[in-house]
């Protein structure tokens, strides 16, 4: 009888209130800690703010905020006044001061050690020490919050299929006004697959890329066993084969390395490289081949200079050199193109030697998610005088052999890529991948777009119209999400209004840039103990790094030294649509190469 009375009382008692931290009351990176079931406390330690919700700035913080320009103002200054920047670029001292500020201001947004992960919304030793997790910039939304975004918005998020079809799917190809080309698009995909290696068997919050940065595991393999299978063990070189007088990767049969190929791909076209998914498209295999050639070329240079070195030292030093080349190309060619700055970004690790800087990195799940730049893809790929749709291009290394690297480089440098921001520019062939990106973001319980904007010191949007810069999509988004503070991160990045004549909107840049620069400059080779000629084979190896560029990489390894850049050189191409709209390729809906990719190991 007493037990029944107890149960009755329990059923009549009011339920516990929602977790008080669900409303994200603590501002300016203050840490919310619940007290009991209905109260909270904000820890404002070292935020520069105080008060119940860490919303009142200290004196020095107030001064800094008054003097600090908005991100859009900084972007405007750096992308205009070309004559002034040409002068600045020629004054080393002044250029170094600005470059140091760019690096530190961005990198300090990502302070090590890592903080949260998909399972821990609070600091824990597991979140710090377990390298198999992606870290997180913001903790996941708590399970006991009333809505998926905390307290704002509806209790259920809209169907991801509806989001993709209404706001993301391409109606007509929109070229990137910055002139980004397919040489850039495939470089981005190839480069990032060394650290974006989601372990889908364990879930989207886990990674197989335990190096968490630029380690060139996509060239050499993630494990020592894979690396050994790819090595020649002579003069430091990697295995290769010669076809029609040119060097290409060895085959799976010759190396016994696991690669992902469908059964119909013949043995002689099953090339084996460091990253198991690079057989997906010839654009990835193009860069895999270029870096294979570069490694063996550097080995020859070091062998000539250091004849007494054995195979192991030649291999290890060459790998360090290629890591350095990669970082330099990414900063000075890749990031500079994306930024659109007239200021010349420079790779010089010594600029940070007198700064407080930690040479370590942990890849964040949000960084992985925001890098899903599928709008870059055109509806067809043009190589020389031939046009290939997705069905013809995927898992078809014969195209690489047919055209050769020279034609690939020339053609991809000429073909413009799509604009990423602005919405409605994702090709039909990868729409399922877009759904997967949204669904996995929900599985990892990302906080809202505005919470991420606040985390990276960007003013939150006040309305959907402010987000999109127009009325149609804004109205439809409001009907689905109800509140701008409930807008999801990933779809928002793709529908956000682009900056003027730019590929991205504000949020993509302000979140992505800190992750990128911290990952690049936090590499061990950039540290004072590593950054010495003696660790790279002397002055000869050091010079290879310090003179590297995308053009020199191609010239040193591709016959004829074709002109190469990350943007098309004809300005008219950035103003006109050059590729057919997706409606003419609606039959591609049934092919989904990126889902094949996801099922095995990684993301496009």
Swiss-Prot record:
Reaction it catalyzes: (5Z,8Z,11Z,14Z)-eicosatetraenoate + AH2 + 2 O2 = prostaglandin H2 + A + H2O; (5Z,8Z,11Z,14Z)-eicosatetraenoate + 2 O2 = prostaglandin G2; prostaglandin G2 + AH2 = prostaglandin H2 + A + H2O; (5Z,8Z,11Z,14Z,17Z)-eicosapentaenoate + 2 O2 = prostaglandin G3
GO function terms (MF aspect): heme binding; metal ion binding; oxidoreductase activity, acting on single donors with incorporation of molecular oxygen, incorporation of two atoms of oxygen; peroxidase activity; prostaglandin-endoperoxide synthase activity
Matches recorded under Pfam families: An_peroxidase, EGF
Active-site residue numbers: 193, 371
Annotated positions of the S-nitrosocysteine modification: 526
Keyword Glycoprotein: yes
Gene Ontology BP terms: cyclooxygenase pathway; prostaglandin biosynthetic process; regulation of neuroinflammatory response; response to oxidative stress
Biological role: Dual cyclooxygenase and peroxidase in the biosynthesis pathway of prostanoids, a class of C20 oxylipins mainly derived from arachidonate ((5Z,8Z,11Z,14Z)-eicosatetraenoate, AA, C20:4(n-6)), with a particular role in the inflammatory response. The cyclooxygenase activity oxygenates AA to the hydroperoxy endoperoxide prostaglandin G2 (PGG2), and the peroxidase activity reduces PGG2 to the hydroxy endoperoxide prostaglandin H2 (PGH2), the precursor of all 2-series prostaglandins and thromboxanes.
Name of protein: Prostaglandin G/H synthase 2
Lineage: Eukaryota, Metazoa, Chordata, Craniata, Vertebrata
The encoding gene: PTGS2
């Amino acid at each position: 009888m007493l037990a029944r009375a107890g149960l009755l009382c329990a059923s009549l008692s009011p339920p516990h209130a929602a977790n008080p931290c669900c409303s994200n009351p603590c501002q300016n990176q203050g840490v919310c800690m619940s007290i009991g079931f209905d109260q909270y406390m904000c820890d404002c330690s070292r935020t520069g703010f105080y008060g119940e919700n860490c919303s009142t700035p200290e004196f020095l913080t107030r001064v800094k905020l008054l003097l600090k320009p908005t991100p859009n103002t900084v972007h405007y200054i750096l992308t205009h006044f070309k004559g002034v920047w040409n002068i600045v670029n020629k004054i080393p001292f002044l250029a170094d001061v600005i470059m140091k500020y760019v690096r530190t201001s961005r990198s300090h947004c990502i302070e090590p050690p890592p903080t949260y992960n998909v399972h821990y919304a609070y600091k824990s030793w597991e979140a710090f020490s377990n390298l198999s997790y992606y870290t997180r910039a913001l903790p996941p939304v708590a399970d006991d919050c009333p809505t998926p975004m905390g307290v704002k918005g509806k209790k259920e998020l809209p169907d991801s299929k509806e989001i993709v079809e209404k706001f993301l799917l391409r109606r007509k190809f929109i070229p990137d006004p910055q002139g980004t080309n397919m040489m850039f698009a495939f470089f981005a995909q190839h480069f990032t697959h060394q650290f974006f290696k989601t372990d889908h068997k364990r879930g989207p919050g886990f990674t197989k890329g335990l190096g968490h940065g630029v380690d060139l595991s996509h060239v050499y393999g993630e494990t020592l066993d894979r690396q050994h299978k790819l090595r020649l063990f002579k003069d430091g070189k990697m295995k290769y084969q010669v076809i029609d007088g040119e060097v290409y990767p060895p085959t799976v049969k010759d190396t016994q390395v696991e690669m992902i190929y469908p059964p119909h791909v013949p043995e002689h076209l099953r090339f084996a490289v460091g990253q198991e998914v690079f057989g997906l498209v010839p654009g990835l295999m193009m860069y895999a081949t270029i870096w294979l050639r570069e490694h063996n070329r550097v080995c020859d240079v070091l062998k000539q200079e250091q004849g007494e070195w054995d195979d192991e030292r030649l291999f290890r030093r060459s790998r360090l050199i290629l890591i350095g080349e990669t970082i330099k190309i990414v900063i000075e060619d890749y990031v500079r193109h994306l930024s659109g700055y007239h200021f010349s970004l420079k790779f010089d690790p010594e600029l940070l030697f007198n700064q407080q800087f930690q040479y370590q990195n942990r890849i964040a799940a949000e960084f992985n998610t925001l890098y899903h730049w599928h709008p870059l893809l055109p509806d067809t790929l043009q190589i020389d005088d031939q046009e290939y749709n997705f069905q013809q291009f995927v898992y078809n290394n014969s195209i690489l052999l047919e055209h050769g690297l020279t034609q690939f480089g020339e053609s991809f440098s000429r073909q413009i890529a799509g604009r990423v921001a602005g919405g409605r520019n994702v090709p039909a062939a990868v729409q399922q991948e877009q759904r997967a990106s949204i669904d996995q973001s929900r599985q990892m319980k990302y906080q809202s777009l505005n919470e991420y904007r606040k985390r990276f010191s960007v003013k939150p949007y006040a309305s959907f119209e402010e987000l999109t810069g127009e009325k149609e999509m804004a109205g439809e988004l409001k009907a689905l999400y109800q509140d701008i503070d409930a807008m999801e991160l990933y779809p928002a990045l793709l529908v956000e209004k682009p900056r003027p004549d730019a590929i991205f909107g504000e949020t993509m840049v302000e979140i992505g840039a800190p992750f990128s620069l911290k990952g690049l400059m936090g590499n061990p080779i950039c540290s004072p103990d590593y950054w010495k000629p003696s660790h790279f084979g002397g002055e000869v190896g050091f010079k290879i790094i310090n003179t590297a560029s995308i053009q020199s990489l191609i010239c040193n390894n591709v016959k004829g030294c074709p002109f190469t850049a990350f943007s098309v050189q004809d300005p008219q191409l950035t103003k006109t649509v050059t590729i057919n709209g997706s409606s003419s390729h609606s039959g591609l809906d049934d092919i989904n190469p990126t889902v094949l990719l996801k099922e095995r190991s990684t993301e496009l």
